[in-house]
Amino acid sequence: MTVKLTIDCMGGDHGPSVTVPAAVKFVRAHPDAHLMLVGIESAIRAQLKKLKALDDPALTIVPATEVVAMDDPVEVALRKKKDSSMRVALNHVKEGAAQACISAGNTGALMAVSRYVLKTLPGIERPAIAFALPNPTGYTMMLDLGANVDCEPQHLLQFAEMGHALVAALEGKERPTIGLLNIGEEVIKGNETIKRAGELLRASTLNFRGNVEGNDIYKGTVDVIVCDGFVGNVALKTSEGLAQMLSDIIREEFGRSLMSKLMALLALPVLMRFKKRVDHRQYNGAALLGLKSLVIKSHGSADAYAFEWAIKRGYDAVKNGVLERLARAMADNSVSLGEGEHNAGGAGHASPAAGHHAEPSAAQSSKA
């Protein structure tokens, strides 16, 4: 089976100078992949020519006349730039020409345009960015990592349901454990949104283990950690910064003297394994969960190596039938929001009827 993906070549801080080289390298390593490079044709051609890939049959240029800038308001991306590389790439997925879209573009714009073009799964009000973060025994699924900076309690319940379904689909776990990210384990901790979300989660049929703290993220305390996009994005980027700092400190310490350099040579295999494990670029690419089609969000600051990993996330998701498995798991393990809210004493608000998809408000998301 040929895996067909659309690449928003103009998205991110670096645009085609990063996205096109990553795409070229990816198809050369994956002969069953076909990538549609969406964006300003002249800019894409210039990069392909430089890489001697203009005639590569695994790459197709799809012209788009507009670009969603990283600082564009959501309204501009959604209502004015209807021929942007982001929108055209998503339209190709909607029309069935591709199976997934990969973009490093403005997070808020990508969330809003994806939601408008592709629609959400039944019962899901807002998509969320989900990613598997490493822990000592495997990984912890965490969401939201930046799609929704302000959330209501029922949104956090929906994120938990999606995380539950994704882990159930990928790992075969019947009852994945769920934790709510908070400033303490006690029920009384947190703001009103977190407290009400905790009530909804305790009243649901999910395997909710209560509040977890930031130091639980990489311990593997629970299978799924739920938070709003503001907190999740800060936690993720703090982790990446810490990993980079540790690598820099080790490099600096081993370079201080001739003796330390000799010790570094002896420890080189261990150091290389350490460097690989903490290189956040290989963890680039997170799924925008809750949509009817696959969308992978790359960091806007990604280099070509990191963006290639984001492409691989989309490729692997298609090959493994993640979307279909997620939809089945959500149907099998669905949580009734109305019942949960009733049992929680009315905390939260009723979600809108499934199938109603007006153009989203800019207040629901932001650039990340």
From Swiss-Prot:
Record's catalysed reaction(s): a fatty acyl-[ACP] + phosphate = an acyl phosphate + holo-[ACP]
Superkingdom, natural source: Bacteria
Region (Disordered) location: 337-368
EC class name: transferase
GO CC annotations, alphabetized: cytoplasm
Start-end of Low complexity biased regions: 349-368
GO molecular function: phosphate:acyl-[acyl carrier protein] acyltransferase activity
Primary location group: cytoplasm
EC number: 2.3.1.274
Keywords of the record: Cytoplasm, Lipid biosynthesis, Lipid metabolism, Phospholipid biosynthesis, Phospholipid metabolism, Transferase
Pathway(s) where this gene product acts: Lipid metabolism; phospholipid metabolism
Gene Ontology biological-process annotations: fatty acid biosynthetic process; phospholipid biosynthetic process
Subcellular location(s) per record: Cytoplasm
SUPFAM superfamilies tied to this protein: Isocitrate/Isopropylmalate dehydrogenase-like
Alphabetized InterPro entries for the sequence: FA_synthesis, Phospholipid_synth_PlsX-like
Function comment: Catalyzes the reversible formation of acyl-phosphate (acyl-PO(4)) from acyl-[acyl-carrier-protein] (acyl-ACP). This enzyme utilizes acyl-ACP as fatty acyl donor, but not acyl-CoA.
Subunit structure: Homodimer. Probably interacts with PlsY.
Record family assignment: Belongs to the PlsX family.
Record protein name field: Phosphate acyltransferase
